């Protein structure tokens, strides 16, 4: 035993074991011991000689490995298999080669051992021999080489050699004289002649390359009468093209000729599978050869010969000719050539395969790898089963073994049974499973498992998911498949005999139904090529009857043309009824049909090629339809299955029906195309109409066009039954029509959904517009012909983001307005087309901006919201136009731009005039402003002062920025123009400031930039708004600096210049909205901003977050509202401001901080409230991140931002600001009124405003110094105006509407988390709110609640709300007109007062900003629902009413707003708090209450 156990070292394998006491275990144990007597005794008991151990090793393998010659002889004599595969793929031949014993190896080779086999590592016996060591390997390798040489000589015709050397034993070198005695078996003696009855007896020889014999004395043949031929004997036919097709993952079959016989040769093809072991895969052919040599059946592909290469390394199998190819290629790769498989053909093919499978089972074989690859269609209607390389053979012990250990390729998992995939024992039930899968595949035209990768299928099965029967299967076949696809083998109750019985009965019934049609010969026509899809159904190509003979011969002629014309990877193409390009089909040879069909074919192929996923008619559906047609042909009254319409009457009626159906199909096609166009236009980027859907649609649409070629080719169908033809066409057309109907239904559903979305967006926009109009009470002031916009060039009109922003912000009203005009007509996603369009306008606006900034601002601003006025005008016009002219968006927007430009110019002059008029009132306003400033300062000092929404403005800017962000390209240009305008404005401001004085320059610049920059800056205002905000902080900084030094003024000029540049844009937009002219408020806004900067410093991050949230909310709103656009623009601006302005402010922040510290000191010296006022009116000038940094850098600053841009002189600033504010209020009210009134009016007002702005710009040049201070105001005004655009037109209306709407809006827009976070942040950083503020907050809450109710009512009554808002706006506009006129008169009177008014205006603007943030908040909220919009609108209406009342008292109201002492101011702080812009504690309380509400 010890001797037997000792293995040669190094041994390539280990020996397995058997742990039981069975005879097999004893046999293995005795073999290891080398006990010949006991082994023979056990063998005599009839034990299974090839019983395996734990490693799959047989007793013969162990004996050969250990070199036990006698045991090998006895085991072979008892029938041990020399080629039995161990689990590692090795065979006893490998073991013998390793043992180094030539006798053992020769014995195994004589018994049929094969030297070509490989183990799982690709090692053949020669490799094993070399592993044994040089001493033993040399002899073994030489022996194997002699065997190979002998075999080669025999193959080459030297058969006489067999007479001398008939056994490998005779090739052993150094055979002992008494070798026969040494073998232990007289039959194994190499010296004795072969004797009949033994393995090497008679004519059977084996030299390690398969058992063969000589036929006719010379021809070498393998067992099974398989001639062994050389490679040169198989050649390509010269009368047919090369035709190759895949017969599985690793095999390729090629049509060749052997000795004049047309054959198909199978060979290994691993080029596409480089990771597979070519050496090991070669064993597959050997295994199939051995299996095929034992099988003979009419439906098993007949192996005719074996082709060996000269070096015996390569084997090719020669089969009978396969004319068509595999079933897989017919169903999935070349379906165009076989548009329809008749049902009787399908059943006939399935019966043939089931017969062959039953034959295999009867012989003890299990196919295991049955798939559509293994079914070869040798000719029309004739199928053969092949691919036997993975087949397993039953053994005596009942187990099955395969000739190779090659695992089943994952590519075949789609058809394999679960037990085969997970490598468990396979049975005949496994083949039934695979057969059921094929039945489903051929009837549904779908690859099993939808073509999933094998590895995925295996994972799916392991996870407990299995393939299920397709419910589309016909009844009898559904039962078959359902039973066969059961997971457990025992549940597959149907056997092949049952399946065959069901199929035969079904075929009989089917054929019996067809016998009434003598003209029908579907079987002959089964595989005809049909370039015309209309004849697909019957496979009745419209060729003359000669085509029935199109069988093998014609298919041969087509040859490789058949091969996968659609590509190997387009299995789904099969589903398309479209025929291949006519050239592909032999039928194409008929030119008359070619000409007729080629157009349709080309279209069909084009339709197919785009999407392999196209799901046109499935073959089984066509088959059913065809079957139904056959039935209906017999019984015209019977309905075609699945068509739902009875085909009645004679051929004439059918012809009429066919024509009518074709016409209907064409109509449907056009409708589908139209709907598709609409759908595409409605959303260029919309994925609702996916590419697959589109391709599928195209595919289906192509089919209706085919009837025309079919009609053209009708002449060729003389020999066919007209009834059959018409029925086929009608059925196909009906099926296509059904498909088109489904497509149309889907498209209509998608379009309807989009339309509903657009309607909702439009409603929201309309509500927002009305809300916005109501908030912009100045819209009602459109009556006043002169625009009283802020003179400061730095004035930043509320950026009403134009279509670009609107596009950017699907929720923004502005976006929606501009977008809706485009979107409505196009049905495009509101943001997509309009976005693209707006981007284009924006680019154009860039160029235009360079040419004419005013004009560019208008044009660009519109796409970019660069010009709030133009945006507002366009928005109003869009709001008005969109409903009436959804498709006129470009027109309306263009007019909006033009009108914006014109109105900007005219309004500029008007604003300047109003400014002059306001200068007169400047003194009073200034005084009031001072008083208010003092009050506000006191409040700020005590922590009770409500900080103007510098953050709100930033929030608005952020929102608008967010909106602009959606329009990045336009935004960039806008920013560029903005910077250009800003620089120019800054330069101009510097010039004007130097000569004219800060206040005067501020006014002049304000007006000038408003007018002059209004056009370009309208465009830039969108971009500039961010700089403007940046500049605004600079402005506040500059105002302080201006009071401190001219350098600060210059800085403010540069900053304001940008701001004013933005502001003119904004003012242009605002002129459209009329809110843009809130420069005074802008100044006031700076004051507020100063306060808010304090708040920002304390809570700017939260505010930023809040603003970001507002921006996020505003974006949805922006699409619906200009307010949102303004907010979006503001958001962009504030983002830009936050980035450039606030970040720059960061650098300036230190200076600003110093400036703030110093100016506040001076202010404190003058008036302690000035610091608070500065806090309110000044804005930190950090351009890059001052906004964020301010909040972070100076969280503990009481109220002043790091840098104050508000002039130190509260009186002059307040007067100027008041004048500006009044002018702006009146102008914005006019614009708002105009916008709400009509697009044309708003456009005209925009034009007028543009003109005014132009004149104002020109005048502003002289007022550069004033503009410095006023620029800051305009910047804030721009923000405020933006806010007014959202909230109200006038500062008062803004203050009121924003207060109420802000509270409600903030409540709605601010998320609880955000509010809580902001509140907490503010709580941490800010002092507790005063009782007065709390009271105000409660009052505001009540107003909000009422406004919410109003909003709901408004939502239900948006029209009335808009009217009310317009009315309120008009009222406010009148009051604002008065105020603005007074303010402008005052401004004209006193430049210093203008500066002061600018401050006051800034304060007022700050108030407006504070309110606009609410609007901004409302805007974000508005997207949440029309109710909110309505409520915001109602709130704004109420606020506007209050504003109108206050506007009647412009001086009084302004000071209040500026100082924040007024009730509005208190409300504003509440709103600010809610927004998180004001003191955190207040905000927290308001936010919490709002949230709780």
Curated annotation (Swiss-Prot):
Gene Ontology BP annotations: attachment of spindle microtubules to kinetochore; cell division; intercellular bridge organization; male meiotic nuclear division; mitotic sister chromatid separation; mitotic spindle assembly checkpoint signaling
Compositional bias (Basic and acidic residues): 1026-1037, 1154-1167, 1363-1380, 1426-1456
CC terms in the record's Gene Ontology section: cytoplasm; intercellular bridge; kinetochore; midbody
Region of interest (Disordered), ranges: 559-615, 782-904, 940-1081, 1115-1167, 1288-1307, 1341-1466
Keyword field: ANK repeat, ATP-binding, Cell cycle, Cell division, Centromere, Chromosome, Cytoplasm, Kinetochore, Mitosis, Nucleotide-binding, Phosphoprotein, Repeat
PTM comment text: Phosphorylated on Thr residues by CDK1 during early phases of mitosis, promoting the interaction with PLK1 and recruitment to kinetochores. Phosphorylated on Ser-430 by PLK1 during late prometaphase promotes the rapid depletion from kinetochores and its subsequent degradation by the APC/C complex.
Domain Protein kinase: 198-511
Gene3D superfamilies, per the entry: Ankyrin repeat-containing domain, Transferase(Phosphotransferase) domain 1
Keyword DNA-binding assigned: no
Superkingdom of origin organism: Eukaryota
InterPro entries per record: Ankyrin_rpt (IPR002110), Ankyrin_rpt-contain_sf (IPR036770), Kinase-like_dom_sf (IPR011009), Prot_kinase_dom (IPR000719), Ser-Thr/Tyr_kinase_cat_dom (IPR001245), Tex14 (IPR039339)
Localization: Cytoplasm; Midbody; Chromosome, Centromere, Kinetochore
Compositional bias ranges of the Polar residues kind: 559-573, 855-904, 1001-1020, 1053-1064, 1131-1144, 1343-1362
Keyword presence, Isomerase: no
UniProt short sequence motif GPPX3Y, positions renumbered to this chain: 789-795
Motif (D-box) on chain: 846-854
Residue ranges, compositional bias (Acidic residues): 1066-1075
GO MF, any single term: protein kinase activity
Purpose of the protein: Required both for the formation of intercellular bridges during meiosis and for kinetochore-microtubule attachment during mitosis. Intercellular bridges are evolutionarily conserved structures that connect differentiating germ cells and are required for spermatogenesis and male fertility. Acts by promoting the conversion of midbodies into intercellular bridges via its interaction with CEP55: interaction with CEP55 inhibits the interaction between CEP55 and PDCD6IP/ALIX and TSG101, blocking cell abscission and leading to transform midbodies into intercellular bridges.
Subunit structure: Interacts with KIF23 and RBM44. Interacts with CEP55; inhibiting interaction between CEP55 and PDCD6IP/ALIX and TSG101.
Family per record: Belongs to the protein kinase superfamily.
Notes concerning its domains: The protein kinase domain is predicted to be catalytically inactive.
Record's protein name: Inactive serine/threonine-protein kinase TEX14
């Amino acid at each position: 035993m010890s001797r037997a156990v000792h293995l040669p070292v190094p041994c390539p394998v280990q020996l397995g074991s058997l742990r039981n006491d069975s005879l097999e275990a004893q046999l293995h144990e005795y073999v290891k011991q080398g006990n010949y007597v006991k082994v023979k005794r056990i063998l005599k008991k009839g034990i299974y000689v090839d019983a395996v151990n734990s490693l799959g090793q047989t007793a013969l393998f162990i004996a050969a490995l250990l070199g036990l010659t006698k045991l090998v002889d006895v085991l072979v004599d008892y029938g041990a298999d020399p080629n039995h595969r161990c689990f590692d793929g090795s065979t006893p031949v490998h073991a013998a080669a390793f043992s180094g014993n030539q006798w053992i190896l020769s014995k195994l080779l004589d018994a049929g051992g094969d030297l070509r086999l490989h183990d799982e590592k690709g090692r053949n016996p020669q490799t094993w021999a070399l592993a044994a060591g040089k001493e033993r390997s040399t002899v073994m390798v030489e022996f194997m080489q002699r065997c190979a040489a002998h075999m080669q000589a025999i193959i080459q015709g030297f058969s006489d050699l067999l007479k001398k050397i008939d056994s490998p034993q005779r090739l052993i070198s150094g055979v002992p004289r008494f070798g026969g005695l040494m073998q232990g078996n007289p039959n194994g003696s190499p010296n004795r002649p072969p004797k009949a009855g033994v393995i090497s007896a008679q004519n059977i020889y084996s030299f390690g390359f398969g058992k063969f014999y000589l036929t006719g004395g010379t021809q070498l043949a393998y067992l099974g009468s398989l001639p062994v031929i050389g490679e040169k004997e198989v050649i390509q036919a010269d009368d047919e093209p090369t035709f190759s097709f895949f017969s599985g993952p690793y095999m390729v079959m090629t049509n060749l000729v052997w000795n004049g016989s047309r054959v198909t040769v199978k060979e290994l093809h691993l080029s596409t599978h480089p990771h597979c072991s070519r050496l090991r895969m070669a064993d597959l052919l050997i295994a199939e050869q051995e299996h095929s040599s034992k099988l003979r059946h009419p439906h098993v592909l007949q192996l005719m010969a074996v082709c060996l290469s000269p070096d015996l390394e390569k084997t090719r199998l020669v089969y009978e000719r396969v004319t068509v190819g595999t079933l897989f290629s017919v169903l999935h790769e070349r379906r165009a050539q076989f548009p329809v498989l008749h049902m009787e053909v399908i059943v006939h093919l399935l019966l043939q395969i089931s017969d062959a499978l039953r034959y295999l089972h009867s012989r003890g074989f299990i196919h295991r790898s049955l798939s559509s690859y293994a079914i070869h269609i040798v000719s029309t209607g004739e199928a053969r089963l092949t691919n036997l390389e993975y087949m397993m053979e039953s053994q005596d012990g009942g187990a099955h073994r395969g000739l190779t250990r090659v695992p089943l390729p994952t590519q075949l998992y789609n058809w394999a049974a679960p037990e085969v995939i997970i490598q468990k024992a396979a049975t005949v039930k496994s083949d039934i499973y695979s057969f059921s899968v094929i039945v489903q595949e051929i009837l549904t035209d779908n690859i099993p498992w939808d073509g999933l990768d094998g590895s995925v299928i295996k994972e799916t099965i392991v996870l407990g998911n299995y393939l299920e029967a397709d419910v589309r299967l016909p009844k009898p076949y559904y039962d078959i498949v359902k039973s066969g696809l059961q997971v457990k083998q025992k549940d597959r109750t149907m056997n092949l005999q049952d399946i065959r019985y069901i199929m035969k009965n079904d075929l009989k019934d089917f054929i019996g139904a067809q016998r009434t049609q003598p003209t029908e010969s579907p079987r002959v026509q089964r595989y005809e090529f049909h370039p015309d899809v209309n004849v697909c159904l019957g496979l009745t190509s419209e060729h003359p009857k000669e085509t029935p003979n199109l069988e093998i011969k014609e298919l041969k002629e087509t040859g490789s043309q058949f091969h996968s014309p659609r590509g190997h990877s387009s299995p789904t193409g099969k589903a398309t009824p479209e025929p291949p390009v006519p050239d592909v089909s032999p039928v194409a040879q008929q030119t008359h049909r070619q000409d007729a069909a080629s157009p349709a074919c080309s279209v069909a192929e084009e339709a197919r090629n785009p999407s392999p996923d196209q799901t046109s008619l499935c073959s089984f559906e066509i088959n059913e339809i065809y079957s139904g047609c056959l039935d209906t042909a017999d019984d015209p009254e019977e309905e075609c299955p699945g068509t739902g319409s009875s085909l009645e009457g004679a051929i004439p009626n059918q012809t009429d029906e066919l024509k009518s159906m074709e016409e209907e199909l064409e109509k449907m096609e056009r409708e589908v195309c139209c709907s598709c166009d609409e759908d595409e236009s409605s959303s260029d980027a919309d994925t609702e109409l996916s590419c697959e859907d589109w391709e599928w649609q195209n595919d289906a649409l192509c089919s209706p066009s085919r009837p025309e070629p079919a009609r053209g080719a009708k002449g060729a169908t003389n020999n066919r039954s007209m009834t059959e033809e018409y029925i086929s066409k009608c059925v196909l057309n009906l099926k296509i029509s059904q498909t088109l109907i489904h497509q149309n239904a889907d498209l209509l559903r998608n379009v309807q959904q989009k339309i509903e979305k657009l309607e909702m967006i439009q409603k929201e926009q309309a509500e927002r517009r009305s809300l916005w109009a109501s908030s912009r009470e100045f819209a009602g002031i459109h009556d006043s012909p002169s625009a009283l916009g802020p003179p400061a060039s730095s004035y930043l009109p509320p950026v009403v983001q134009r279509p670009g922003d609107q596009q950017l912000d699907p929720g923004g009203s502005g976006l929606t307005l501009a977008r809706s005009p485009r979107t409505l007509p196009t049905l495009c996603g509101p943001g997509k087309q309009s976005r693209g369009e707006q981007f284009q306008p924006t680019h154009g606006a860039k160029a235009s901006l360079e040419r004419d900034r005013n004009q560019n601002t208008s044009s660009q601003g519109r796409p970019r919201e660069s010009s709030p006025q133009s945006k507002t005008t366009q928005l109003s016009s869009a709001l008005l136009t969109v409903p009436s002219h959804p498709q006129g968006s470009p027109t309306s927007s263009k007019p909006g731009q033009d009108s914006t430009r014109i109105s900007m110019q005219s309004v500029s002059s008007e604003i300047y005039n109003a400014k002059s008029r306001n200068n007169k009132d400047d003194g009073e306003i200034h005084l009031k402003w001072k008083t208010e400033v003092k009050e506000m300062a006191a409040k700020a000092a005590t922590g009770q002062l409500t900080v103007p929404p510098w953050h709100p403005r930033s929030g608005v800017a952020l929102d608008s920025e967010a909106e602009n962000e959606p329009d990045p390209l336009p935004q960039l240009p806008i920013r560029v123009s903005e910077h250009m305008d800003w620089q120019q404005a800054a330069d101009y401001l510097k010039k004007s400031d130097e000569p004219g004085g800060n206040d005067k320059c501020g006014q002049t610049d304000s007006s000038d930039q408003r007018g002059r920059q209004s056009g370009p800056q309208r465009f830039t205002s969108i971009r500039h708004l961010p700089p403007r905000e940046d500049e605004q902080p600079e402005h506040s900084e500059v105002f302080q600096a201006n009071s401190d030094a001219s350098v600060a003024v210059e800085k403010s000029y540069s900053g304001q210049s940008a701001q004013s540049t933005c502001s003119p844009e904004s003012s242009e937009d605002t002129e459209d909205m009329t809110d843009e002219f809130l420069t005074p408020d802008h100044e006031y806004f700076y004051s507020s901003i100063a306060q808010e900067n304090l708040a920002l410093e304390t809570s700017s991050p939260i505010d930023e977050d809040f603003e970001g949230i507002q921006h996020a909310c505003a974006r949805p709103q922006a699409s619906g509202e200009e307010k949102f656009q303004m907010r979006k623009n503001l958001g962009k601006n504030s983002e830009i401001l936050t980035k450039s302005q606030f970040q720059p402010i960061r650098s300036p922040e230190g200076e600003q901080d110093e400036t703030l510290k110093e100016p506040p000191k001076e202010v404190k010296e003058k008036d302690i409230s000035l610091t608070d006022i500065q806090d309110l009116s000044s804005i930190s000038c950090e351009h890059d991140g001052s906004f964020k940094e301010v909040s972070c850098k100076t969280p503990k600053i009481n109220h002043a931002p790091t840098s104050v841009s508000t002039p130190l002189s509260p009186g002059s600033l307040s007067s100027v600001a008041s004048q500006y504010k009044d002018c702006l209020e009146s102008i914005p009210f006019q614009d708002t009124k105009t916008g709400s009134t009509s697009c044309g009016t708003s456009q005209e007002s925009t034009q007028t405003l543009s003109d005014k702005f132009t004149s104002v710009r020109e005048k502003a040049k002289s007022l550069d110094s004033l503009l410095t201070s006023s620029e800051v105001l305009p910047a804030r005004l721009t923000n405020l105006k933006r806010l007014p655009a959202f909230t109200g037109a006038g500062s008062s209306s803004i203050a009121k509407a924003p207060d109420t709407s802000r509270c409600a809006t903030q409540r709605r827009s601010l998320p609880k988390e955000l509010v809580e976070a902001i509140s907490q942040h503010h709580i941490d950083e800010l002092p507790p709110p005063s009782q007065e503020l709390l009271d105000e907050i409660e009052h505001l809450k009540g107003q909000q609640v009422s406004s919410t109710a109003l909003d709901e009512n408004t939502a239900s009554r948006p029209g009335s709300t808009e009217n009310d808002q317009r009315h309120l706006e008009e009222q406010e506009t009148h009051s604002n007109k008065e105020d603005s006129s007074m303010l402008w008169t005052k401004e004209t009177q006193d430049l210093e007062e203008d500066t002061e008014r600018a401050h006051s205006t800034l304060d007022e603007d700050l108030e407006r900003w504070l309110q606009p943030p609410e609007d901004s908040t409302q805007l974000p909220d508005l997207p949440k629902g029309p109710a909110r919009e309505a409520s915001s609108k109602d709130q704004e209406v109420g606020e506007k009413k209050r504003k109108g009342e206050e506007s009647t008292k412009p001086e009084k109201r302004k000071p209040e707003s500026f100082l924040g002492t007024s009730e509005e101011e208190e409300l504003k702080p509440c709103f600010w708090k809610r927004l998180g812009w004001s003191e955190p504690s207040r905000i927290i309380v308001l936010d919490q209450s709002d949230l709780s509400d």
